[in-house]
């Protein structure tokens, strides 16, 4: 079950809001002006909430017109950002439409209610996180433990009521709680605490991203007042063995599991069994989740950002771990990064088909650390071969293997977006990070994706160890140019954070930083540090993020970089046409002999005619092609045209075996002369522009 969505749906309902406003009215505190307004409009919120939630669930699409027409949703402070002009909102959503505009307004409406809950009912509330501060690198368990001894909050009571109903209906012997982020930790402990108090016979285990990264040095025995087990890394075998231990108490075989033994915290990894291979783990099962009740929200008017919160995506991975595994800011010492294991494309597409059949949804988010280009190519080919209609996106490295032709193939298979790390946008720092890319290379790759119709989101970083103010300004200019040219559509600046399991965290002296070390008895991931440069990188946050927000909306490119800051910054040293010049190189005549040649178009209509010149005549053939958007034709000598038709058929995307460029060249030269003259002729170039790909 997903307690998160079930709590949200119970809270944001007619009955939920009636109870909420009643509870708030008993609070003897002085409400702020915004909360007073929301209380005054409580009947409007109660009246509209069920309709708005149904709309965000995709069940009430006609409500979009009423929401967009105005005077339907009660408006509090979150709507102040719209006061400039209704034209601004219409312009911002010009590329996204009325449904998305209505989702954005409905999201502001929910955020107003969230602000009210935080001020008047429960200060820890958040839509996707709760009491996040308590879980953020809490080296000691003291604060969390003290919080868990306090009275239940309003949200706690709703959560535990739903949990109790579920436990009574299922009567489980083992409850496994997944904790992906710090914002899920407090609620996980509250649930475990409730189970231990009211259902002491049930065993409780924690797993997921948070313990995998943060709890590897766990020593505090008090944690096991709530949980019987905490497992690390891949969960299939550890959970299977926990189940065996619950069913057969004397089993005593564990995989990467913390537990209490003789009143001490012990880590057990005593099984001789190996983890399941990725090909063996099976397809995710969403059977018990309320798939039709999730809400789709849009926080800001940006098409890429909406992917994270608008709609529900089936989650899969192309490969376990990262095929690069060198970035110095990344947790490359942990198994979820360092153990690289790709999955065969055929198995992946089998899983996609199974999920489509089970969920009725054909949208997929591949949640790889960095999806491998070669595997993405094979996945795309398999999707096209099976004639599937799917929509998918993933995380990548901006590496040179993402050629223009590969991007066209990915788009044809249903890829709509990619996200990747440009990080510091400085070649010196990218080398220090061991990113394996340059700014120029990133520009070329993002151009290839953009021109194929795939949206690009860039993760951006500032404050990396040894980064100078000049480098921060120059990276900002690089980003400005990339947005102005149009090869980036979305981005996000985040400040560098030093983690315990990254090379920077493990070898801080090599990177010129001094860590502030504490005794670790509970969580250990984010490490506070001092950079020997002495630069206060915090002050750049607002200017970087504000400029980026405007660049994403296609405006303010002519502003001086100084305009975004209220303190003096140096002039950029980056040439104003650096990115533009990076894209000038033409590699269209460079094709590897081993490159697969793939035709993703259809069969041509062949017509013959005779051409005459200076008393000579010869037979020609016109090949007419129809694709989804247009018709085009090329004319060739008859024998070469027939050879080409044969080659296109052999290399059609539906076929298992494709000829390489070298094999095609050899085949051509057995019949004709001057292959290069033919292959790089105007007629074949037209085909290349319309689906003849070198991969």
Predicted segments, located by residue:
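Radical SAM [4Fe-4S] cluster-binding motif and immediate context
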Residues: 284-455
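N-terminal [4Fe-4S]-dependent radical SAM core
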Residues: 144, 264-315, 630-633, 689, ...
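A structural motif corresponding to the C-terminal lobe/cap of the Radical SAM core domain
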Residues: 9-17, 29-36, 40, 44, ...
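Flexible loop/turn segments at secondary-structure boundaries
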Residues: 6-10, 182-186, 212-214, 239, ...
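Glycine-rich beta-alpha loop elements in corrinoid/cobalamin-binding modules
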Residues: 1-82, 89, 106-109, 132-277
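Active-site cores of enzymes that catalyze phosphoryl transfer or operate on phosphate-rich substrates
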Residues: 112-162, 299, 303-332, 336
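Radical SAM enzyme core and accessory elements
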Residues: 16, 20-25, 33-126, 529-695
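Secondary-structure-rich domain cores
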Residues: 154-226, 342, 346-349, 353-356, ...
